[in-house]
């Protein structure tokens, strides 16, 4: 049995940050990926984008583990997902804005 299954979030964070233990990250991922995916999917309705967003949040957690001062793990992860979803909306809103005038110009018959 995996010893990390019984760990609290605070214990996992300690092992992640201070011990640099990848098994702690793996346990955090197993514990929360489904909830985070569902949170993203509720807003985006796109499987691949949501999987990518969740993966990015966990990669960021690992890469920046020493820089972050995380007190409460799950609320931190939820906030990170919301931010990534917001950024996805922001990034994708720009495209239709610039494409729309071109479609209008193209649809005008030549004179």
Region locations from a protein language model:
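Short, small-hydrophobic-rich alpha-helical interface motif
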Residues: 16-17, 36, 40, 50-61
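Amphipathic, Lys/Arg- and hydrophobic-enriched alpha-helical face
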Residues: 29-47
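Short, aromatic/basic-enriched loop-to-helix "N-cap" motif that marks the start
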Residues: 64-80
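Amphipathic alpha-helical segments enriched in hydrophobic/aromatic and basic residues
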Residues: 13, 25-29, 39, 54, ...
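Acidic, proline/glycine-rich intrinsically disordered inter-domain spacer in sigma factors
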Residues: 92, 96, 104-111
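N-terminal module of bacterial RNA polymerase sigma factors
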Residues: 1-30, 34
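Arg/Lys-rich amphipathic alpha helix in sigma70-family domain 2
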Residues: 79-99
